Amino acid sequence: MKNEKLYREALQVMPGGVNSPVRAFKAVGGKPIFLVKGRGPRVWDAEGNEYIDFLASWGAIILGHAPKKVVKAVQEEAEKGLSFGLTNPHEVTLAKLVVEMVPSVEKVRFVNSGTEATMSAVRLARGVTGRKYIVKFEGCYHGHYDSLLVSAGSGVATFGIPGTPGIPEEIAKLTIVLPYNDVQALEEAFKEYGSEIAGVIVEPIAGNMGVVPPKKEFLIRLRELTKEYGSLLMFDEVITGFRLSKGGAQELFGIEPDITCLGKILGGGLPVGAYGGRREIMERVAPEGEVYQAGTLAGNPLAMVSGSETLKDLRDKEPYKELEEKMEKLARGVKDILTEKGIQHTINKVGSMMTVFFTDKKVVDFQTAKTSDTELFAKFFRALLNKGVLIPPSQFEAWFLTTAHEEEVIDEALERIRDAVKEL
């Protein structure tokens, strides 16, 4: 069946024809493609077109598509049952792996998505501290939970305004929004509201304004201030968890938060989220404590098996140096191609994730990220897609590599990108 026919049918039964807005390709133009198969570093659409995949399910895939060991384990588990509604042994296996691999986590609670993880972490921070305000940073996305789907107004430290209809202003005002990487704004906010701040949630490496690394002093000062004022520091490692190192960004930077939110790679391609932290904090979660959170499908056995097999592979093989070297090769190649064409650009990368911004400015926060030429990005995206290279259909997202992206695949992708850029 053709992509366009599928899209027309989807429009009749799903809002915008999709189950997540970015999939509609509104930011890049053209009709969305429908993917039907993935193997290793490649995916195929409903028309049989093949793409080298740098979307990697928005970073959820790190071993390549359909890794045999993971697929086999899931198939075997599926034969035993799809969901039980009570605790299964695989939850214990995955929880032990998370505690082993993530430095700050002593206990962990599984949920079904990154949004559930951040939502639950915020509730826990408020429950533990008895305070109401949450600090987030402009351009950092933490799922579609009411308290976190807010944008900043003008000024250094602003109370949030709703980022979408359906969020009451009264709820949004409980979130203080600050510029990412701005230590002075952070200090001013704590000076004014510190005794009322329950917690600070941050992507330790921003991935939803494109890849924006933190300034060294930013995370250090963030940790110092939260300790000083008795607020909880929450790292949203839904993207960075298990991608940059087996212990995520917190291991990379040597900074331990109070609560860590996980997702994406944690499920090995199946829907899983989690939040975890120090024992005394997590023991405030029901049924041990009074902070309530629950889920019918939380700890689903298929997702637990998929996640466990994925984390075991990452723990045992630690492919991170190799992934970083491959991303360096890809980034250098893309930079050379764009430079030869005379296209202004900035490439930000950390480990196996990168973003190409079409701006001559150094991108250090959401405001500088927004200087990127989004119209040029849309043309770039469509040109790459036509040549068989799939990147995220948004300027403000990351490209990802998997262990299945061998050197020759990178070379092949760069040739396709070179051909595509010639047409810009």
From Swiss-Prot:
Its cofactor is pyridoxal 5'-phosphate. It comes from the Bacteria. GO terms for cellular component: cytoplasm. It is an enzyme of class 5 (isomerase). Pathway: Porphyrin-containing compound metabolism; protoporphyrin-IX biosynthesis; 5-aminolevulinate from L-glutamyl-tRNA(Glu): step 2/2. It holds the Pfam family Aminotran_3. Its EC number is 5.4.3.8. It catalyses: (S)-4-amino-5-oxopentanoate = 5-aminolevulinate. InterPro entries: 4pyrrol_synth_GluAld_NH2Trfase, Aminotrans_3, Aminotrans_3_PPA_site, PyrdxlP-dep_Trfase, PyrdxlP-dep_Trfase_major, PyrdxlP-dep_Trfase_small. This is Glutamate-1-semialdehyde 2,1-aminomutase. The gene is hemL.
